[in-house]
A protein has these predicted regions:
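Extended, subdomain-level signal for the structured scaffold at the beginning of enzyme domains
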Residues: 1-95, 99, 108-117
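A conserved active-site-flanking secondary-structure segment within enzyme catalytic domains
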Residues: 115-125
Length: 125
């Protein structure tokens, strides 16, 4: 079965993270939320508390096909600063698997250099 993981950090944009989870699950794709904050409860940019399905450090990434980064501030900054996530994204990119990011989060990929030679749009557009 196809698997997608949506990475959550304090300050993520709730609609960008949770709408993706909803749509992918409706499409029959096994989708999990993964906290990079060291705790399951994550507070979104608008104060909504979300319980992640798993913690980054306890998650098996061997079969995941798509990594999704929602935007929001300071969530995007937390995503940029997480070294384990950076290593995972770079490996995923080398393996030509799917990477997705919304709003400000494409800057995470841009900072890693994986958007060179590719068209991408991010906030501010």
């Amino acid at each position: 079965m196809k698997k997608a993981y949506v990475f959550l950090a304090d300050g993520f944009e709730e609609i960008e993270g949770l709408t993706v989870v909803d749509l992918l699950r409706r499409a029959g794709i096994e989708t999990r939320t993964v906290s990079i904050m060291g705790q399951e409860e994550i507070q979104g940019a608008h104060g909504i508390i979300v319980k992640a399905d798993s913690l980054f450090e306890n998650t098996d990434f061997s079969e995941v096909k798509m990594l999704v980064l929602p935007g929001g501030m300071p969530g995007t900054i937390h995503l940029k600063e997480h070294k384990g996530l950076e290593e995972l994204i770079l490996k995923h990119n080398e393996e030509k698997k799917y990477l997705a990011a919304i709003c400000a989060a494409p800057t995470v990929f841009g900072g890693m250099g994986i958007l060179k030679g590719k068209k991408a749009i991010c906030y501010p557009g």
